Amino acid sequence: MYKKIIAKVALNKNDSGFTPYKYDLNVYRGCEHNCSYCYAMYSHKYLDDDKNFFNNVYFKENIAEILNFELSKKSWKHDLIGFGTVCDSYQPIEKDLKLSRKCLQVMLKHKNSFYMSTKSDLILRDIDLLKEMSKQFPISLALSIITTD
């Protein structure tokens, strides 16, 4: 089930010291990929929905507009952003909503580096943006492949 939420912020500060990025950007909360090794299920407890991480996917309808506002601030230092750190940014519904694509367009506009991982081939839809970004500033993509063994 998909549930719309309105984002108050796009970027969340990550001061754990365990990651190379200082800010997280999560377009979705919850994940239909249902990976057995998922480390992000804890994030649903903040939505009072901790038993339904793989069934209820929340999408932040206004995320691109908020991201554009935050990256436009004079105080923004172009820190590295972890894009989709709590769940995959290419959920099946992304094909219709295009929220991650809109966020990529904002990142291109502001020339802001990011790290993203996905297991979805839907990332190929955005290869035009990713190619253009890689010509202008550093980006890092990690792709996982599902196997049966």
Language model: regions and residue ranges:
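Conserved Radical SAM active-site core
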Residues: 1-28, 32-142, 148
